[in-house]
From Swiss-Prot:
Compositionally biased residues, Basic residues: 900-910
Keyword Calcium recorded: no
Sites where the protein binds Zn(2+): C894, C896, C905, H906
Binding site for ATP: Q87, G105, E106, G107, K108, T109, D512
Membrane topology category: Peripheral membrane protein
Name of protein: Protein translocase subunit SecA
Broad class of where this protein is predominantly found: membrane
Family according to the record: Belongs to the SecA family.
Amino acid sequence: MLSKLLTKVIGSRNDRTLRRMRKIVDEINKLEPQFDSLQDEDLKAKTVEFRERLDQGESLDLLLPEAFATVREASKRVFGMRHFDVQLLGGMVLNNCQIAEMRTGEGKTLTATLPAYLNALTGKGVHIVTVNDYLAARDAETNRALFEFLGMTVGINVPNMPPQAKKEAYSADVLYGTNNEFGFDYLRDNMAFRPEDRVQRERFFAVVDEVDSILIDEARTPLIISGPAEDSSDLYTRINLLIPQLVKQDQEDSEDFRGDGHYTVDEKSKQTHLTENGQEFVEELLTQQGMMAEDDTLYSPSNISLLHHITAALRAHVLFERDVDYIVKDDEVIIVDEHTGRTMPGRRWSEGLHQAVEAKEGVKIQNENQTLASITFQNYFRLYSKLSGMTGTADTEAFEFQSIYGLETVVMPTNKPMVRDDMGDLVYMTEAEKFAAICEDIKERFAKGQPVLVGTVSIEKSELLSNALKKEGIKHEVLNAKFHEKEAYIIANAGQSGAVTIATNMAGRGTDIVLGGSWQEEISNLQDPTDAQIAQIKVDWKVRHETVLAAGGLHITGTERHESRRIDNQLRGRSGRQGDAGSSRFYLSMEDGLMRIFASDRVSNMMKKLGMEEGEAIEHPWVTKAIENAQRKVEGRNFDIRKQLLEFDDVANDQRQVVYELRDELMNADDISGMITQNRDDVILAVVDTYIPQQSLEEMWDIKGLEERLKADFDLELPIQEWLDTEEKLYEEALRERIVAKAIEVYQQKEEVVGAEVLRNFEKTVMLQNLDTLWKEHLAAMDHLRQGIHLRGYAQKNPKQEYKRESFELFEEMLDSLKSDVVSILSKVRVQQQEEVDRMEEERRQQAEELARRQQYQHQNAASQIADESDAGQPAESGTFEREARKVGRNEPCPCGSGKKYKQCHGKIN
């Protein structure tokens, strides 16, 4: 009560933030007449003046009012568009490393030019990050004229650019690109062998457009660069033939129940589990096929690979649907992004899932891949000195932005009041009833000329609705993963009178729907339009615009509630831009995924009590509340998954930073002989300690073993026994020093033969090659450790702590192996001349180019990877852990002490 009263008196934190910034807006507005009177040349000269003032120690904050006034004036002259005050506020929020929540149509693209110009004055470069290639190219081309007018360069960063073109793009003052491409460039740069092969420079300031999509929706999916592993396509094909013989069982096995089915499905966590009956049946099938010995079991260590293939194939058949999770095009399985409905060519699911789906669809099975480098968006974007973002929907995720990225969300006021009518949800018993009601509503709105945008959750649903509308004779456009090449055109015309547009899962995001259609689109289609043509197009558009407003503006129809309220708000946000009229409504059924999994019992009972008849809908605040609660549950679970991913990836990230810093040091150094000398001393002394323990009696020494080891590992033939026999005063410490000195002497002789320069180049090449090989193997070891670490809960140990401890041990082992491998190679190799080093370098370059051609860039399905760990990864409760000899029932409390049922905890390991 008191907090509400205080908020009313002094305003919320958001209000106070905006109030402080409005003073600076007033300052910028006062400068407008002065800047308006400047000649073009004087306005352009401001950039040089600002840079000189920065060099003299003036801060960006002091420059901000004048810099923003400069951009606003330049925009008026170049585009004929003046930044609104709310856009100036948005620009300040972005410069302050905060997230600006700006409604659709408020001009986020133009807002970003303000902080981009200000921060680009430093010469360090600004990255404006978008969700797809089309938006990156569009925004770069749209704003290029403005930045170039002010003497700044603009670049674009999209896939498949030649390295030199990428390097030039990164040297631009302002660079537009996609989140994936920035992340992959970072990983590729840290796989390069020469400084000149890298494209990125320092990561200074990033403005992330649609920040919720990139930093929240895609945060669960790490970016992975992988190379081809061994061919196992035949195994996928053979196992794929077995899966259709398995029968689904609806109820989990327990002490009181053992079903006849072979597997159960957990839709919430997207997991499948073999039942006891299923395990026996699969073992029988594998034995018949000669793929497993008769007396063997599926869970024996020798059959881990078979279990991996069975699990992947079962998930592919049961949980991944064609035209929902992926499409098949040109004999390829292409993933559909669950958040945007866009296809993701070149991206592949990991852990054999993609190959299992290829086997299921009968297309060519590509080799499994081995991880070469990976990073999450969370850890990539935290590398920037300054990070900010903008979106139409951030407030529901404000806590996550603050806790994970340290970014405060500021909700921006609209330039004009929002008048959209958001109507209550209508809930039907069946999907058929729901779609019949949607068709009827569209028919009525179509008849009066009101444009309708229909949001669906999958390609399958969009095509189902499309077929129903065709039967009714209603002309419409379908925008989904299959046809997103014409996305911008369809969206540009979605506001025309009577237009009906079906869009899968917010495809087309980033393009405004203008009532009456886009007059800019019409003008761009003309070659050299005259002033008269442009004027006529604007007059015609004005008439169409008023007609659509009179019909009620754009109506949004949601065919299903998304797991996240934010995605629903994004769909609604397409209507009511810039104070336009509009309306929205969601239609739901008890057969929808969200309702079936999370809200079914409560709402279904409510509907039965009300005596619902076929075709009748329920509209009640209780139902809306139940649905919101279901969405909150999913949002909470997804937040936990993202947080879990980050906690595990933070461990790997610390190691990644060490390795990448070492690579940088190696690449930039002309001479690493000091590092090699230190490593050689450490490695040889460690070997000597193994055979001559420190402060030990001579009787405990294994001199013969030491001589053999030095010969085998370092090609050092030393008569150590002879030294000891002939020199009475050759004690342990003196002996250690002599062995190291002899190793140095032999290496110096090698340097005299081949020359210092040749050997320095060779040392660097060997060090880099071995570091990359061992890092790749270390990533694989970390993956294996991660997949099984949740089992430590059985032993009353905290899996996260165990993961940290063991991954550190693995990392130390990797660094020790790097030292010993490099010293061994350099000691044993015979380098004759510079040509040999050049040949070796050329071979390495060719191998790297071949690997680059075969590299896969993918988003790992991290949700499935973590689903097991999210429950088991909690700190174990204290107390004695007693394991019973009998098998734990799936509905019994899990032995790990989490308090959850076994099937919801460690029973998920299948």
